[in-house]
Amino acid sequence: MTNKTSLSYKDAGVDIDAGNALVDRIKGVVKKTRRPEVMGGLGGFGALCALPQKYREPVLVSGTDGVGTKLRLAMDLKRHDTIGIDLVAMCVNDLVVQGAEPLFFLDYYATGKLDVDTAASVITGIAEGCLQSGCSLVGGETAEMPGMYHGEDYDVAGFCVGVVEKSEIIDGSKVTDGDVLIALGSSGPHSNGYSLVRKILEVSKTDPETTELEGKPLADHLLAPTRIYVKNILELIENVDVHAIAHLTGGGFWENIPRVLPDNTQAVIDESSWQWPAVFNWLQTAGNVSQHEMYRTFNCGVGMLIALPASEADKAIALMTAKGENAWKIGIIKASDSDERVVIE
């Protein structure tokens, strides 16, 4: 009888020991994100979280997102430390526009071959994003799937749940003629438009690590982590009558602003109210990208757009400025039955 080789999971490309080593590496940073409502620690079959007692009629708000092909750029440049912040930001910023306070976050990390150092760097970034937004990292899934991804390439997805008082949900229904639009500045392209970014780099034959822009590598501008606005916006909501908030993500101005506008209203954006950050000017020039396409693909320096009564505008700008945001009046809401929901002039 011939002796057959005894195969193991590791022979098939799945290293359980590496997965366990990763869990040991991240326990400390995950613990720092813990909210008092969270029960139990990492390792359970499910994460338990009570609702904060201050809510009378709590409504749960959920969201999921990724970071798109910004991830490819980060892998090519071997810079993994801020991708986790991007992942959290894309989820929690979507929650806060409805007035929701993020409660907990889960991540999904999939790779062809688990590199513990890379994964730990990404998850440390996720924990940092959770700290910035005040939510707990309660669990996640690390999937090592040989044959599904090339080598140590990886993908990440995030899932977040928040809570808002039912009577305080922000849904855009209060937006009306005469409202003022306040902009909160972005940190860069955030996590959208990176397939176009990468195409521009390819066509222009630009090395983002050796090309300088405003005294630092272009790569620093392109990989700047997505700004997390949660804590500052929650404070704004407590002090100002906010009618609507739009998170400028994929689809830019043309797609995201109409999502919070009632029928028969139009957002009029004053293009002269701000200057695009240098990275957007570089992208437009290097890629010969039209103005319309820029506003459809990128945030062009505007991460959040907030609609509120004109009488509250100065107060809102002062409060956000005091909190470190770059805030300014960017436009107004007009009554209109036009099919053009957004006008930039």
Swiss-Prot record:
Biological pathway: Purine metabolism; IMP biosynthesis via de novo pathway; 5-amino-1-(5-phospho-D-ribosyl)imidazole from N(2)-formyl-N(1)-(5-phospho-D-ribosyl)glycinamide: step 2/2
EC number(s) on file: 6.3.3.1
UniProt keyword annotations, A-Z: ATP-binding, Cytoplasm, Ligase, Nucleotide-binding, Purine biosynthesis
Record flagged with keyword Cytoplasm: yes
Localization: Cytoplasm
Chief site of localization: cytoplasm
A cellular component annotation (GO) from this entry: cytosol
Any single Pfam family the record assigns to this protein: AIRS_C
Signal peptide (UniProt feature, chain positions): none
Root EC class: ligase
Any GO molecular function: ATP binding
Known catalytic reactions: 2-formamido-N(1)-(5-O-phospho-beta-D-ribosyl)acetamidine + ATP = 5-amino-1-(5-phospho-beta-D-ribosyl)imidazole + ADP + phosphate + H(+)
Cysteines paired by S-S bonds: none
GO terms under biological process: 'de novo' IMP biosynthetic process; adenine biosynthetic process
The family this protein is said to belong to: Belongs to the AIR synthase family.
Name by which UniProt lists this protein: Phosphoribosylformylglycinamidine cyclo-ligase
Native species: Enterobacter sp. (strain 638)
Gene responsible for this protein: purM
